């Protein structure tokens, strides 16, 4: 009796896909790996002129001189080096978005706390204003609509400054 190999749960649920040409199965990979497989299996049938193989990068010539040299060696016109296809490299730029998400989450929590603190700041400013009005103007002024008006004017003026200063202290 043959020994059956034990497979872990992770190996059991691994997804298998067929290769690009469908000949055999392979594990799932990134698109870069698939591009590299395509690149390796591609047969290059393009004729590369001998002159273009030894060209120095940055050595620019006009197409007329290239055609004249090619016509001297070959009777038929050939492909100029300017139309010669260079093998591409597939470069994947990975952008690490985790710091951006962390900063965004912290700023959302921070502004949420500011919304909660805004009510506390307004209540404390109302208390401060009412006490100062009672001391300066007198008790007859308390309870009138002017108290709410004054608090409504002073509260929004003070809260943006506190929000900006606390945000700047958080950053620096």
Swiss-Prot record:
Gene Ontology annotations for the cellular component aspect, listed alphabetically: endoplasmic reticulum; endoplasmic reticulum membrane; nucleus
Lumenal topological domain: 1-101, 165-172
Keyword Endoplasmic reticulum: yes
Coiled-coil segments on the chain, per record: none
Key words of the record: Endoplasmic reticulum, Membrane, Transmembrane, Transmembrane helix
Chain ranges passing through the membrane: 102-122, 146-164
Superkingdom of the organism of origin: Eukaryota
Cytoplasmic side: 123-145
Keyword Transmembrane among UniProt keywords: yes
Topology class, membrane: Multi-pass membrane protein
UniProt-annotated location(s): Endoplasmic reticulum membrane
Note: Present with 704 molecules/cell in log phase SD medium.
Protein name, per record: Uncharacterized endoplasmic reticulum membrane protein YNL046W
């Amino acid at each position: 009796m043959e020994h059956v190999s034990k497979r872990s749960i992770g190996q059991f649920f691994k997804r298998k896909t067929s290769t690009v040409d469908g000949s055999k199965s392979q594990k799932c990979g990134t698109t870069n790996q698939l591009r590299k497989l395509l690149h390796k299996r591609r047969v290059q049938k393009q004729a590369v002129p001998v002159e273009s193989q030894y060209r120095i990068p940055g050595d620019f010539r006009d197409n007329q001189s290239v055609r004249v040299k090619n016509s001297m060696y070959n009777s038929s016109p050939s492909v100029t080096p300017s139309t010669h296809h260079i093998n591409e490299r597939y470069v994947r730029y990975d952008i690490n978005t985790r710091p951006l998400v962390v900063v965004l989450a912290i700023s959302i929590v921070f502004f949420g706390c500011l919304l909660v603190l805004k009510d506390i700041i307004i209540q404390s400013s109302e208390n401060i204003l009412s006490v100062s009005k009672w001391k300066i103007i007198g008790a007859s002024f308390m309870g009138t609509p002017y108290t709410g008006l004054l608090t409504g004017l002073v509260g929004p003026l003070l809260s943006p400054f506190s929000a900006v200063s606390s945000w700047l202290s958080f950053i620096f």
